């Protein structure tokens, strides 16, 4: 009766699969790290100021407008941005860029703001 021990462990056949699993996990980790660092700021060493990366590349995952106003004269508005309801926010948001560069949130339910939005969309600059 000859008992020969198998000198090759049975786990050798599973090593390529294990290596693939490790590589997959590492690639997922690197992908997650790379995407999380894109939104961080970088330091401008020449000026000593922080400047943020281009914010147009990233979508906000929450409502942009916390406080709204309806008391704005249409002649002060340079442009309007209307953001519809979505998964990020359950209300319509109207963001006005003023001629001095500031951005303010307008109340989309106010009759005056509705009229301003309609006139701006129609291309009429004389909305009252």
Swiss-Prot record:
Annotated Gene3D superfamilies: 2.40.50.40
The keyword Disulfide bond belongs to this UniProt entry's keyword annotation: yes
Localization in the cell: Secreted
Gene Ontology molecular-function annotations: chemokine activity; CXCR chemokine receptor binding; D-glucose transmembrane transporter activity; growth factor activity
Database matches in Pfam families: IL8
GO BP annotation list: antimicrobial humoral immune response mediated by antimicrobial peptide; cellular response to lipopolysaccharide; D-glucose transmembrane transport; defense response to bacterium; inflammatory response; neutrophil chemotaxis; positive regulation of cell division
Disulfide partners: 63-89, 65-105
InterPro entries on file: Chemokine_b/g/d, Chemokine_CXC, Chemokine_CXC_CS, Chemokine_IL8-like_dom, CXC_Chemokine_domain, Interleukin_8-like_sf
GO cellular component: a single term: platelet alpha granule lumen
PTM comment text: Proteolytic removal of residues 1-9 produces the active peptide connective tissue-activating peptide III (CTAP-III) (low-affinity platelet factor IV (LA-PF4)). Proteolytic removal of residues 1-13 produces the active peptide beta-thromboglobulin, which is released from platelets along with platelet factor 4 and platelet-derived growth factor.
Keywords: Antibiotic, Antimicrobial, Chemotaxis, Cleavage on pair of basic residues, Cytokine, Disulfide bond, Growth factor, Mitogen, Secreted, Signal
Signal sequence coordinates: 1-34
Family the entry assigns: Belongs to the intercrine alpha (chemokine CxC) family.
UniProt-listed PANTHER family: PLATELET BASIC PROTEIN, SMALL INDUCIBLE CYTOKINE A
Job description of the protein: LA-PF4 stimulates DNA synthesis, mitosis, glycolysis, intracellular cAMP accumulation, prostaglandin E2 secretion, and synthesis of hyaluronic acid and sulfated glycosaminoglycan. It also stimulates the formation and secretion of plasminogen activator by human synovial cells. NAP-2 is a ligand for CXCR1 and CXCR2, and NAP-2, NAP-2(73), NAP-2(74), NAP-2(1-66), and most potent NAP-2(1-63) are chemoattractants and activators for neutrophils. TC-1 and TC-2 are antibacterial proteins, in vitro released from activated platelet alpha-granules.
Assembly mode: Beta-thromboglobulin is a homotetramer.
Protein name stated in the entry: Platelet basic protein
Species annotation: Homo sapiens
Native organism taxonomy: Eukaryota, Metazoa, Chordata, Craniata, Vertebrata
Gene name, Swiss-Prot/TrEMBL: PPBP
């Amino acid at each position: 009766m000859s008992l020969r021990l198998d000198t090759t462990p049975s786990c050798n056949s599973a090593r390529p699969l294990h290596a693939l699993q490790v590589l997959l996990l590492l690639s997922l980790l690197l992908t997650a790290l790379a995407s999380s660092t894109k939104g961080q700021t970088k330091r401008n060493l020449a000026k000593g100021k922080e400047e943020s990366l281009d914010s147009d590349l990233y979508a906000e995952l929450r409502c942009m407008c916390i406080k709204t106003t309806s008391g704005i004269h249409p002649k002060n508005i340079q442009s309007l941005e209307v953001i519809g309801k979505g998964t990020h926010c359950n209300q319509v948001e109207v963001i006005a860029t003023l001629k001095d560069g500031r951005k303010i949130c307008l109340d989309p339910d106010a009759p005056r703001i509705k009229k301003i939005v309609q006139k701006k969309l129609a291309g009429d600059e004389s909305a009252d």
